[in-house]
């Protein structure tokens, strides 16, 4: 992505945002927040609510709650806010006739797309697609995008079976209505231990991160391979980590060779996020792609959380420099729109094999256009790289200053997509709670990890505030 502006340290993307956190209550939520949550509980499940937010007052990198507490947000709504709260560009776009028309006349895109849909799809998705990707299916969420990616791989496998007349057989047509073969064949999708790909029936079967996501739910008996468990610092464990990655590739080979039914797709995150911010080297992904190609298995890269700039490139997998583009790349979160990029028209099934009423949300496609243009205009990828380097160096210093508190620091050279392990799950949870009451909204992942997910407008002065708070509270 080319840039049209150069950001200096004196440039503030949000000149009117607070100078820093400000806490007015002894707890978060405070009295007003607790009262609002109680009112919500009459109609809405609040069991996972952290605190209600005043989104009218929130700005830039700062959340404001109902009691007037101001928090530096380095979790950004589970990595979904790309360019700040109440971004002026987005607010202006929201008041445009284009957005008003599309919001108030939401189309069933599969049947009745608006006249400008080709332009919207190009400007809001394809223009910023990963290298080599040419087409897009819009969906409603990251889970949905992954689910449909599996479906496209399965339908490609099924539709390309040789048949005497070229059309589906009577037995296939009849048996599928009874959830039976040959019309409903047994096929599988390979995923990796500690992965997270969503909570729908197919995507949940490939999610392997936490029991709470899966307990009580039926699941497809699909295979999983180990994701590399790298040792840190990376430069001190080169040989061990290479052996670990090869072990995982050998496991993939074994599964694809011996699984009892065809494995039609393999899905993987560039960095396992919910599962603990687990990394692997570009060499691992090169070997994985080669292994999948050998067995004619579709390669799906889940960029739902890693996509749209947090790693310093628009798409994390582009840092691997693969010889071929992945078969599919799924996206959501910071993109705001959700969907699947692909480059082979053969993945398009017959009409109505993949279909739903909405087939995406045209408003979100328009919103993504403004977001991605803002990323380019404000040179936010370079901002993420430079701030990420500064932040990582600061965390290295704190790790030396506080031995045993910041373990397995990872994400060097990956923008602000940084994480570390606390001593225990309890220590991690306490740290997150302490940071919140001291003005920083931060999140965890995996067993005992802290993951940083600031916005792309997170700057050096924000990083200095964050490092100071970590130093005080770790």
From Swiss-Prot:
Residues 1-13 have a biased composition (Polar residues). Its cofactor is pyridoxal 5'-phosphate. Keywords: Aminotransferase, Cytoplasm, Pyridoxal phosphate, Transferase. GO terms for biological process: gamma-aminobutyric acid catabolic process; glutamate catabolic process. Transmembrane segments: none annotated. Substrate binds at residue 199. The modification N6-(pyridoxal phosphate)lysine is found at residue 333. It is found in: Cytoplasm. Required for the degradation of gamma-aminobutyric acid (GABA), which is important for utilization of GABA as nitrogen source. Deaminates GABA to succinate-semialdehyde, which in turn is converted to succinate by the succinate semialdehyde dehydrogenase. Cannot transaminate beta-alanine (BAL). Belongs to the class-III pyridoxal-phosphate-dependent aminotransferase family. This is 4-aminobutyrate aminotransferase.
